[in-house]
């Protein structure tokens, strides 16, 4: 199974994470298939960047985001975009019924 998860970078007591696509059997910091962005929790406020189009493409191919990765992707609207592509946009008429 392919997962979207965080891989730890940085030095001791200064974590920095890359958001990557990886085979679930690989180690946390092992080789990854594709890099989607980064997350720096040390800065105030936390700095994040995600390639939305790549993330949507991988999720539609079947990649499963971990809980933390899903939370970060949701902040960029990736999960909403995937939902709209899979199930269609909700129109105002459907919302009123």
Curated annotation (Swiss-Prot):
Keyword DNA-binding attached: no
GO terms for biological process, alphabetical: translation
Annotated Gene3D superfamilies: 3.30.1320.10
Gene Ontology cellular component annotations, sorted alphabetically: cytoplasm; small ribosomal subunit
SUPFAM superfamilies, A to Z: Ribosomal protein S16
Keywords: Ribonucleoprotein, Ribosomal protein
Family in the record: Belongs to the bacterial ribosomal protein bS16 family.
Protein name as catalogued: Small ribosomal subunit protein bS16
PROSITE patterns assigned: RIBOSOMAL_S16 (PS00732)
Keyword Ribonucleoprotein assigned: yes
Cited Pfam families: Ribosomal_S16
Any GO molecular function: structural constituent of ribosome
